[in-house]
């Protein structure tokens, strides 16, 4: 006998009118074990350069019907790329706009993954005690040790990051100083911070989570309502080209901008980022 799982969003009792994804959507799009593989870097980087992770610090995303989606950064999209980069020899720091702790979509955490979970526990304090992004930006110069900026996905990236002058300044610094920018899924929404100032990403191509897919997820209860705006549409208005219209785990490199389409791309993006950064920085 097949047990039917509910497509109704699950109540998040920590906030009024807030909801987690439905049991059905979680059964389709999450797993207790990740697809991490290919972590093989026999000649890791030994220098001082590191990754700056710009993480989400807000959990609740309003939808069109007033209900709140309980979100944050997606664990797979955050941890798998970082696992590869760390194995390749690159340490990382975490910053949020407020300086308050990173919010994760814990309902997507691969709790039974024997590699990812110890890695997360080892670095949890970085996410719980991040730097304030404005303080990081104030210290940036041509000699700063950050080799890349990484913006993880999850719908939490839609909250605050697209309007942040500090996010814009960090991205402008990275591109001006020939650093890598890495992102996937909804993370590229952070690029919208460049809309109202110098936009060095004009003309770049990326992979990202398709707007069309976001418009479908409420049907299975992944979100409790529809988004009030769609980041792909806005990225196109600012001169960026989104090369995918589906979700296949695709990754893409445009100069030093490395992107992926979804959590299914997290492992491949980690490999791509590690390989590209080793080629650029390993002696």
Curated annotation (Swiss-Prot):
Natural source organism: Escherichia coli O6:H1 (strain CFT073 / ATCC 700928 / UPEC)
Name of the featured protein: Protein/nucleic acid deglycase HchA
Binding residues annotated for Zn(2+), in chain numbering: 86, 91, 123
E.C. no: 3.1.2.-, 3.5.1.-, 3.5.1.124
Primary location group: cytoplasm
Catalytic residues as annotated in Swiss-Prot or TrEMBL: 185 (nucleophile)
Cellular component, GO annotation: cytoplasm
Gene3D superfamilies per record: 3.40.50.880
GO MF term set: glyoxalase III activity; protein deglycase activity; thiolester hydrolase activity; zinc ion binding
Single GO biological process annotation from the record: protein repair
Keyword Hydrolase tagged: yes
Entry's family note: Belongs to the peptidase C56 family. HchA subfamily.
Subcellular location: Cytoplasm
Keywords: Cytoplasm, DNA damage, DNA repair, Hydrolase, Metal-binding, Stress response, Zinc
Source organism phylogeny: Bacteria, Pseudomonadati, Pseudomonadota, Gammaproteobacteria, Enterobacterales
Gene: hchA
Catalytic activity: N(omega)-(1-hydroxy-2-oxopropyl)-L-arginyl-[protein] + H2O = lactate + L-arginyl-[protein] + H(+); N(6)-(1-hydroxy-2-oxopropyl)-L-lysyl-[protein] + H2O = lactate + L-lysyl-[protein] + H(+); S-(1-hydroxy-2-oxopropyl)-L-cysteinyl-[protein] + H2O = lactate + L-cysteinyl-[protein] + H(+); N(omega)-(1-hydroxy-2-oxoethyl)-L-arginyl-[protein] + H2O = L-arginyl-[protein] + glycolate + H(+)
Record flagged with keyword DNA damage: yes
Induction: By heat shock.
EC primary class: hydrolase
Oligomeric and partner information: Homodimer.
Top-rank taxon: Bacteria
Biological function: Protein and nucleotide deglycase that catalyzes the deglycation of the Maillard adducts formed between amino groups of proteins or nucleotides and reactive carbonyl groups of glyoxals. Thus, functions as a protein deglycase that repairs methylglyoxal- and glyoxal-glycated proteins, and releases repaired proteins and lactate or glycolate, respectively. Deglycates cysteine, arginine and lysine residues in proteins, and thus reactivates these proteins by reversing glycation by glyoxals.
């Amino acid at each position: 006998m097949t047990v039917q799982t509910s497509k109704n969003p699950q109540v998040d009792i920590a906030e009024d009118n807030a909801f987690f994804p439905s049991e059905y959507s979680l059964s389709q799009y999450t797993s207790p074990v990740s697809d991490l593989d290919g972590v093989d870097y026999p000649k890791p980087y030994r220098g001082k350069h590191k990754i700056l992770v710009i993480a989400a610090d807000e959990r609740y995303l309003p939808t069109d019907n007033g209900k709140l989606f309980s979100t944050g950064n997606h664990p797979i999209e955050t941890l798998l790329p970082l696992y590869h980069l760390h194995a390749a020899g690159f340490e990382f720091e975490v910053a949020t706009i407020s300086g308050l702790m990173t919010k994760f979509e814990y309902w997507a955490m691969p709790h039974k993954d024997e590699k990812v979970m110890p890695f997360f526990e080892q670095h949890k304090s970085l996410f719980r005690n991040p730097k304030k992004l404005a303080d990081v930006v104030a210290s940036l110069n041509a000699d700063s040790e950050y080799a890349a900026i990484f913006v993880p996905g999850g719908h939490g990236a839609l909250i605050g990051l697209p309007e942040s002058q500090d996010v814009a300044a960090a991205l402008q610094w990275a591109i001006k100083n020939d650093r890598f920018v890495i992102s996937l899924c909804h993370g590229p929404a952070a690029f919208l911070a460049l809309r109202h100032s110098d936009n060095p990403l004009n003309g770049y191509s990326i992979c990202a989570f398709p707007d069309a897919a976001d418009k479908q997820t409420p049907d299975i209860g992944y979100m409790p309502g529809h988004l009030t705006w769609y980041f792909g549409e806005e990225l196109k208005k600012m001169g960026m080209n989104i090369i995918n219209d589906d979700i296949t785990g695709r990754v893409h490199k445009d100069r030093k901008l490395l992107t992926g389409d979804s959590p299914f791309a997290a492992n491949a993006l980690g490999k791509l980022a590690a390989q590209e950064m080793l080629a650029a920085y390993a002696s």
